[in-house]
Amino acid sequence: MATFINLEDSPMFQKQVCSLEGTADELKDRCQKLYKGVKKFMGTLGEASKGESAFAACLEEFGGGPDDPISLSIGGPVISKFINALRELASYKEFLCSQVEHVLLERLMNFISVDLQEAKESRHRFDKAAHSYDQSREKFVSLKKNTRGEIVAELEEDLENSKSTFEKSRFNLVNSLMTIEAKKKYEFLESISAIMDAHLRYFKLGYDLLNQLEPFIHQILTYAQQSKEQSKIEQDRLARRIQEFRTQSELDSQQLVANAESSGANGNRVGGNIPYKNTETSLTADKEVIKQGYLLKRSSSLRTDWKRKFFVLDSHGSMYYYRTNGNKSMGSHHHYSGSSDHNTGVFGRFRARHNRSGSLTEGSLGYNTIDLRTSLIKLDAEDMDLRLCFRIISPQKTYTLQAENGADRMDWVNKITKAIGTLLNSHFLQQSPVRYLDKDNSSSAPANAVVSGDQIRHNDSRQNIGDDVSTILRGLPGNNACAECNAPEPDWASLNLGVLLCIQCSGVHRNLGVHISKVRSLSLDVKVWEPTILDLFRNLGNVYCNSLWEGLLHLDDDCEDGSALSHASVSKPCPEDSFSVKEKYILGKYLEKALVIKDESEANLSAASRIWEAVQSRNIREIYRLIVTTGDVNIINTKFDDITDIDAYHHIDAAEKAVKKRHDPTVCQRIKESNEPRSCLQGCSLLHVACHIGDSVLLELLLQFGADLNIRDYHGRTPLHHCISSGNHKFAKILLRRGARPSIEDDGGLSVLERAMEMGAITDEELFLLLAECA
């Protein structure tokens, strides 16, 4: 050891040992202070990590869940991406804290408790050995010359043992001190450097994470700015509408006052000068609101409360009022309160589109209908002391109503009188009033029915479709029986195969797997039966589908000599047959295609060319036939390159193909000249073409048979890219709901969301949220 030039036990040696011990003691003090600082640093890191996690949790609670309408309105799906990033950053802090603990704190503690402590204990052992050696030496040198030899020998042996122990403890002390001297040269540098490396990794991970989010952050900031500007425009528009509404209300009030004065001058003749439209025309035209507003309605109970109700009179002579729970009942009409709970919710329009609201704007308003066909109207109430009242008297009930002023009362009376006259002078009485409810029946109507009757009819028709799926589908040719065993009134269907099934055969279809047959119930799976699916079934049906899947059976029926029997050795099962018989038949029919007459392509026209033409001509049945009868399982993903020269638009040499060169769509000459993404079809699939055609039934058929949602064309564009570029937001939302990935970048390096925002502000909130959720 270079520090100890001479290892003899000398004053110089002892001085060096003392010097090293002093250094070790000072180092121990410093290490203890550093240990406390590291503990505090670790506590700070831990608190920072917990704080960031708590912040992320608060953001998550603020953003709400995926079905929360407030979450959707404030951009919850977008915030969720930032929440994930914050949690990642918190995990990085936690990892840094663990690195500090493992690399610095534990090693520092080990140095204090092991190395420095060993030096201290070595000093104690050395002092004890030195004292024992001194005593043995003193005893030995104090012997007289006449001391017996055995005593001398015993003390001499004891002296040698003491000296040996002393030397051993002396060198142990030296080793302990030199271990400290050696470690202090690298131990702390290594630990601190490792900590700095951990910091480097921490910041690098954070940078990489935020760098990946940077484009998305800027997109959201851009969108927020655009939304802010759009909101300002909408607020200005609302202010103008409010001003126009107030002006019009004042004009209407003045007109009502003038009409009331005119009616008073004519002896309060009700409906005296009201011009009648053509009765038949007004009743067959689209329903529109003639008058709507609040009236006080007197209850028929003993308490005779007055409640404020919203009444609507439409052009079909229907008068109804809404039963809101927000209005407070009044003990007397003199205690009228103008406050009513008719809040529609700031985000009502957005919520309605997502069908996620429990507010009064979402169709939860019950309403009662007054049958005007057998009613007459009288001014004033039974109690002549009450002002501004009128009565609607029918055989079932008398409605006592009170307006806010005389002009409003006369306007209501005149228009109701006109409606009664219109009903009495029409053939409408002969029609079954299925759309009206009696006074005791209630229904649910959308809030915007107050403004327009079109939405009421639309919702009613949608409800009827939902209730009559079985009737609609069974009404198609051959659909009154199971496609497999002819059992009557099938209650199940295969969405992609387009056939109706009995419950037993549907079980076999489920066992085939969803890649072969997607089985759904006609009555239970109500959300499945969208108009597009119903239209697809209208194009197919049991008769047409079985003409393909059971082609050889039908061929046998047409052959009188039985020459085709060798082609079809299977017979169609009956409803009474066992499950195993039906299973064997269905497996052979769909898995082996044992009864399908194979498609024989024309010499000059391949199956790929024919299905391409069928898609372009929207021939649903021909597409279905080619999918069934063609042996190529990939025909559903036929590309433009499969039917034409691959160099029709762009020449691809071997070198480009080898390096997979990217081809930015913005530099494509054909797209630039036409400004249409469909101009360059190279690499496009049937799904790309269907998105441009805009036929939802055609799109549904391709998706049902497993068309690749994320297939890319020559320019790296998916069908979703094409929908966004052409402004077909409806199809874009369909593809996103079915699993299309908007994160895929085209050969220009831009994702679907980036392409959409490149075209300007995304005004369709639902589309933006779908893009943000799936990105």
UniProtKB/Swiss-Prot annotation:
The keyword Zinc-finger applies. Residues 2-226 form the BAR domain. ANK repeats lie at residues 682-711, 715-744. Expressed in roots, hypocotyls, cotyledons, leaf and shoot apical meristems and siliques. SMART domains: ANK, ArfGap, BAR, PH. Residues 467-603 form the Arf-GAP domain. Residues 288-421 form the PH domain. Signal peptide: none annotated. PROSITE patterns: ANK_REP_REGION (PS50297), ANK_REPEAT (PS50088), ARFGAP (PS50115), PH_DOMAIN (PS50003). It comes from the Eukaryota. GO terms for cellular component: cytoplasm. InterPro entries: ACAP1/2/3-like, AGD1/2/3/4_BAR_plant, AH/BAR_dom_sf, Ankyrin_rpt, Ankyrin_rpt-contain_sf, ARFGAP/RecO, ArfGAP_dom, ArfGAP_dom_sf. Transmembrane segments: none annotated. One of its GO terms (molecular function) is GTPase activator activity. Keywords: ANK repeat, Coiled coil, GTPase activation, Metal-binding, Repeat, Zinc, Zinc-finger. A zinc finger (C4-type) spans 482-505. Probable GTPase-activating protein. This is ADP-ribosylation factor GTPase-activating protein AGD4. It comes from Arabidopsis thaliana. The gene is AGD4.
